[in-house]
Design a protein with these regions (language model features):
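Short, polar/acidic, helix-capping and beta-turn segments at strand->helix junctions
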Residues: 1-125
Length: 125
């Protein structure tokens, strides 16, 4: 394992059960795992907003910020609702404008989850 590797935990039981970290930083690169969010039942925008809030916390714990994000991947269970998620993404990233991919998936780990987001960041050395 690289000596300049930092792992970030959110404390989720899933991390130990699955064997992953919320985020990992190696040198200037930070990868944040697929992150879901909470919100009122069926509110995909609220879930996206909360997922991005959790991603921001993980980035901060790894010594990065939303302004360092260069790529996001968004997984939604209903692509017809893409605009709701896109609006939240645009609000969070403003002029940062990382490259992004959004795809529809058949399901996430729990049936009430509607969106999951990954982020990659690069921190200037």
């Amino acid at each position: 394992m690289p000596t300049n590797r930092t792992s970030v935990s959110s404390g989720s039981d899933f991390e130990a059960a699955v064997g992953y970290s919320r985020a990992v930083r190696v040198g200037p690169h930070v990868a944040v795992a697929g992150t879901t969010g909470a919100g009122p039942a069926g509110d995909i925008a609220a879930q996206a907003r909360d997922a991005l809030r959790r991603i921001e916390i993980a980035l901060q714990q790894a010594g990065a910020a939303l302004t360092d994000v260069v790529r996001t991947r968004l997984y939604v269970t209903d692509i017809s609702r893409w605009r709701e998620v896109a609006e939240v993404h645009a609000q969070a990233f403003g002029q940062i404008r990382p490259v992004a991919t959004m795809v529809e998936v058949s399901a996430l780990i729990a049936p009430e989850l509607l969106v999951e987001i990954e982020a990659d960041a690069y921190v200037e050395p």
